[in-house]
Amino acid sequence: MKCPFCGADDTQVIDSRVNEEGDSIRRRRRCNACDKRFTTYETAELHLPQVVKQNGKREEFNRDKLRLSFTRPLHKRPVPTEYVDRALEHIVQKILAKGEREIMARDLGEIVMQELKAIDKVAYIRFASVYRSFQDVDDFNDVIRDLD
């Protein structure tokens, strides 16, 4: 691997560790030319399916968009970042487990709702109200009744 400081090809790994989740490796490297140290991370390259929108348009799966959609209903809710990160990983794992080349946006929304329901009921209701286009109070009451 090239040194990010001097561009030399002569670097060596001086330490490797697997992260807590077991899905990536952290490597400390040293450049033999300039003697500077740097860290790299190795993860598996996963090909996520394309998302098929309700209008039939297809777009690449976007983790940042997923994070934004997931965290918006959690705004001002007492949910630790670790829970959010874990839930987002669960969502990605569920998508990958399907083994499909495409996923319907509505199916992705249902998976997001399941994860929100598991970590924060208020966020779940907030998301459901937008995702399912609630029209009146009865729609909210139906979802709240289903929580019990």
Curated annotation (Swiss-Prot):
Cofactor: Zn(2+)
GO BP: any one term: negative regulation of DNA-templated transcription
Pfam families xref list: ATP-cone (PF03477), Zn_ribbon_NrdR (PF22811)
InterPro entries, A to Z: ATP-cone_dom, NrdR-like_N, RNR_NrdR-like
Domain ATP-cone: 49-139
UniProt zinc finger (unnamed) residues: 3-34
Alphabetically ordered keywords of this record: ATP-binding, DNA-binding, Metal-binding, Nucleotide-binding, Repressor, Transcription, Transcription regulation, Zinc, Zinc-finger
Top-level taxon in the UniProt lineage: Bacteria
Cofactor annotation remark: Binds 1 zinc ion.
Gene Ontology terms, MF aspect: ATP binding; DNA binding; zinc ion binding
Secreted as UniProt keyword: no
Keyword Cytoplasm: no
Stated role: Negatively regulates transcription of bacterial ribonucleotide reductase nrd genes and operons by binding to NrdR-boxes.
Protein family: Belongs to the NrdR family.
PANTHER family: TRANSCRIPTIONAL REPRESSOR NRDR
Designated name of the protein: Transcriptional repressor NrdR
